[in-house]
């Protein structure tokens, strides 16, 4: 307790008030040491080449000093979600203890992707949120992320079908198997085997058309079907699956049918994909998770366009405690030197924390020092400070004992110096 009644306690009160407001949490992404990694897009892609006369690297929100750090995996125009599902693929690969994500905007409502002409982009926004929630959760537990291909064995004659695409994107994960020619309709069970190996854990999509699917022109029966998809782990006997439940279709009068995906974290093993009705789907790509670590939340920077283009908040929805800390700015994204969507001053400030280490990373932000702060670090990791809160009506300081001990040592040294000087001058 600090009360203003004696010189020594007055000194303690002054020290407490000096502490008040000190070592505030910074709104940045940073790291505790050099064991970190960033996944990004054009705003952190140092390899992007353009010929429009702009200064070199002016599109970056990342500080160019980090371009040769070896701690960045980024691709202009891409994202983890986009590469996971579509033919527009970039082989994101990286490893670190403290993982940062600054990507996701390259699949947003402004693209308006739908599998079918009368589909629903909102369903894809839900897919995006579920995908990133799984990735963030798992990367708080694993050091390494990469992509791997998944091969399958199918006993029929039908070939993969490309039924989910628009003008710019073509889905290739999951793979859909066409109807067998010897069946008049899609009312039959089909299956294929696939194996997951070489990683500690895998993120794979389990997807189905949630609603009433109408057969293609090759379906002479011209019936509606209810999708049913599942994966069965043949090694341990566990079944993962779901059936379509929505009362929507794929016509102008009955719109809304689109692909709904769940993102499963599966262990290595032998699996069977089973469809009880309509198209069989199975994974063609997976995110490979490798090297478990002590739990360390990921840091996610809001990935959005400037206000002239529609964005979404799916990465924010996916970033939940305790496995994820979300960082954002209070202003609209406003590009500076390059265009409206690149080079925002505030986001550059937010990412500037990657230039240096901090002592503590917490929900509120990053703390530079590990002694005291006016804020208690919530969900703190690293060497975190203790809070010192002062009440103005009745000065009370709640403090970490260590700084007070150090203060006592310093006061003791000061007293010894004063005594020494007094003796010195007195003798003189």
From Swiss-Prot:
It is found in: Virion membrane; Host cell membrane. One of its GO terms (molecular function) is sialate 4-O-acetylesterase activity. The active site is at 42 (nucleophile), 339 (charge relay system), 342 (charge relay system). Its EC number is 3.1.1.53. Glycans are attached at residues 91, 149, 193, 243, 313, 328, 332, 357, 371. SUPFAM superfamilies: SGNH hydrolase, Viral protein domain. The keyword Calcium does not apply. InterPro entries: Capsid_hemagglutn, HEMA, Hemagglutn-estrase_core, Hemagglutn-estrase_hemagglutn. Residues 9-129 are annotated as: Esterase domain 1. One of its GO terms (biological process) is fusion of virus membrane with host plasma membrane. It is a single-pass type I membrane protein. The keyword Phosphoprotein does not apply. Residues 130-278 are annotated as: Receptor binding. Residues 1-19 form the signal peptide. Residues 20-404 are virion surface. Residues 426-428 are intravirion. N-glycosylated in the RER. N-glycosylated in the host RER. It holds the Pfam family Hema_esterase. The chain crosses the membrane at residues 405-425. It is an enzyme of class 3 (hydrolase). Belongs to the influenza type C/coronaviruses hemagglutinin-esterase family. This is Hemagglutinin-esterase. It comes from Murine coronavirus (strain A59).
